[in-house]
């Protein structure tokens, strides 16, 4: 009926081929997983970059608005402008280096907004209130983007440090 004579060499070759195929498939799956996670990290960093750019774009408007009402706060406005220029000059740096300069910009912007309390006319200005709202919204979006980035990096680090991937 059936010829059950197996060639032992053919069986060994078939088993080796299956093992090689399984290993190759495993390597491809692992590589794709790493590539997807690395892409997610890059995309999440771009989300942070978008919000940082938005914050950078709001600073000149804030400086102009505050300067109209408070001629005596020029040192604070100069500090904010310098912090913005410094942060913008480090766009291509690593996230850690850039974060340091962005934190300085955030602190300078918060100082200007806090100092505005001393100027009731400025505080009541619709333009200033809108800028405050936009800055607060940007900071919230930046916080969410940072959390998303941190989660993506954490997942990538776990993939790198565990076996099997």
Q: Where are these predicted regions, by residue range?
A:
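A helix-centric hydrophobic-segment signal that preferentially recognizes long
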Residues: 2-165
